[in-house]
Design a protein with these regions (language model features):
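Acidic/His- and Gly-rich active-site-bordering loop/insert found
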Residues: 1-102, 120-127, 361
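Short helix-capping segments at alpha-helix termini
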Residues: 37, 122-126, 156-158, 289-298
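Active-site metal-binding loops of divalent metal-dependent hydrolases
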Residues: 74, 170, 340
Length: 395
C-alpha cells in the first residue's frame, strides 16, 4: 500500500465522470501524472451524444514490436437519484476493509493502481512499449474504444501497436477471455388516438405493445433453451443468448387511447454467434403480427424496429503471454467468461487480443455504496508491475 495510490484514487473518484458529462478534467489529471514519468500522452477528442469527451493514450518505452496495452474506462454510471446511497458518491471513504466511492470497483480503482505502478516504474528497463489507453463512454456502449481502437496506429506513430491488451474491469482478480455481444434496439408502436370511451374508433399502442412483448418473450424462451456444451463452463450462469426488456414508455392520460408506445430491448449473444441474427428474427416475427388491439376496431397499429447500438463479442485465444502472466500474478489456473461487455471487443476488431482482469467485484458495480475490498486494491500495483516486467522488460 502507498499513500500515492490512495491519493490518486481520491482524486479520481472526486471527478464527476458520469457518461453524460465531460471527462476532460479527469483525463487531464491522469495525463499530468504520467507525463513527469516520461510518458508521451495524446488526447483524442470524441463527440459523444453531444458531450465533448476525450480518450487518453499514454506510452513509454522503445518503438519495438510486442509490448502491452493496459486499459480502463474513466466514465461511471449515474448516482443522482439512485436509492440506497449512505455515503457521498464522489468522496473516497475507507471503512474497515472496504473503500467506498463511485468508480472504486468500476473502474477508477484499477486506473489508480495503473498510475501507482507507473509512478515507480524504471523506464530504462523497458525493452518493449507500455501503452495505457483510458477511454470515455464505456458505460453507454463502449463508444470511446470504438473510436480509439482503429486510431492507435496513427496516435502511436513510430511505436508499433501492441497486440495484447489487459482490460481491468471488475473480476475479483479472476481472468476472463470471453464475453457476449450486446445489441440494443427499440420497438415503436404507432396506434390511433381517441377517447377511451370509444376504444373501437382507435387502436391502443400499449395493447399492441403487449403482443409485441409476448412475441419477443416467447422467442426469449427459445433462446434460453439453446445451451451449447462448449459454453457451459465459460458462462455457467447463462450459457445461452439472453434478452432483457429495458424501458417502456407510452400514454399520457387514463381517458385517452394511447397513440404511441416505445420499448427498448437489449440482448446478448454467445461469442460465436452473429449478433444481428436475433434482431433480424425479431423483426421477422413482429412483421407477422396483426396490429389490431383488443377492442376489435378497424385501425391497425404500425410496428417499427430500429437498431440502437452494437458491442461485439469477445472470444480471445487461449495460451497467450498475457494470460500466462495474469495466471502467475493472480494464482488463477483457468479463464472464463464475463457477464458484461468491454472495450476489449473493439480492441479485438483492431487486431489486439484482450483479456479481462481487475480488482473490483461485479456485484458492487453500478450499486449504491459501491466499494472495493482493501486487500484487492492494495495488491494491485505490485501485480501490474509484475505483468509489465514480464511482457515489457524481460529479454
Amino acid at each position: 500500500m502507498s499513500d500515492y495510490l490512495y491519493d490518486v484514487a481520491k482524486r479520481l473518484v472526486a471527478f464527476d465522470t458520469v457518461s453524460s458529462k465531460s471527462d476532460r478534467d479527469a483525463m487531464d489529471y491522469i495525463a499530468g501524472e504520467l507525463a513527469p514519468r516520461g510518458f508521451k500522452t495524446a488526447l483524442q477528442p470524441v463527440e459523444l451524444s453531444g458531450v465533448a469527451q476525450v480518450n487518453l493514450v499514454a506510452w513509454l518505452g522503445p518503438p519495438t514490436a510486442d509490448g502491452l496495452i493496459i486499459s480502463g474506462h474513466v466514465d461511471t454510471v449515474p448516482f443522482d437519484g439512485q436509492p440506497g446511497w449512505e455515503r457521498a458518491p464522489l468522496t473516497l471513504e475507507i471503512a474497515g476493509e472496504r473503500i467506498y466511492g463511485r468508480g472504486t470497483t468500476d473502474m477508477k480503482g484499477f486506473i489508480a493502481q495503473c498510475l501507482d505502478a507507473a509512478h515507480t516504474l524504471d523506464s530504462t528497463r523497458l525493452k518493449r512499449p507500455l501503452v495505457f489507453v483510458f477511454t470515455a463512454s464505456e458505460e453507454i456502449g463502449c463508444l470511446g474504444a470504438h473510436s480509439v481502437g482503429p486510431a492507435l496506429k496513427q496516435i502511436l506513430g513510430e511505436t508499433p501497436v501492441p497486440r495484447l491488451a489487459w482490460i481491468g474491469e471488475p473480476t475479483s482478480w479472476g481472468v476472463s477471455h470471453a464475453h457476449k455481444s450486446i445489441v440494443s434496439f427499440q420497438v415503436t408502436v404507432r396506434g390511433a388516438g381517441g377517447h377511451s370511451g370509444a376504444p373501437a374508433k382507435g387502436v391502443n399502442a400499449i395493447a399492441v405493445m403487449a403482443r409485441v412483448m409476448d412475441t419477443i418473450g416467447g422467442y426469449q424462451q427459445e433462446l434460453t433453451a439453446r445451451r451449447p456444451a462448449e459454453y457451459l463452463e465459460v458462462f455457467p450462469d447463462a450459457p445461452c443468448d439472453v434478452l432483457n426488456f429495458g424501458t417502456i414508455h407510452g400514454g399520457i392520460a387514463l381517458n385517452m387511447i394511447t397513440e404511441e408506445c416505445k420499448l427498448r430491448v437489449s440482448y446478448r449473444t454467445l461469442p460465436d454467434a452473429e449478433p444481428l441474427d436475433v434482431f433480424h428474427e425479431i423483426e421477422r416475427r413482429l412483421a407477422a403480427l396483426d396490429g389490431h388491439d383488443y377492442a376489435g376496431g378497424e385501425h391497425r397499429a404500425k410496428i417499427e424496429t430500429s437498431l440502437l447500438n452494437i458491442v461485439p463479442p469477445l472470444n480471445s485465444p487461449r495460451g497467450t503471454a498475457l494470460e500466462s502472466a495474469l495466471f502467475e500474478v493472480t494464482g488463477e489456473k483457468t479463464s472464463g467468461g464475463a457477464l458484461y461487455g468491454t472495450d476489449g471487443s473493439w480492441f479485438t476488431r483492431s487486431g489486439i487480443t484482450s483479456l479481462i482482469c481487475g480488482p473490483g467485484d461485479l456485484e458492487q458495480a453500478h450499486q449504491p455504496n459501491e466499494h472495493v475490498r482493501r486487500d484487492a486494491f492494495d495488491r494491485g500495483p505490485a501485480m501490474i508491475r509484475k505483468v509489465i516486467e514480464r511482457l515489457c522488460c524481460a529479454a
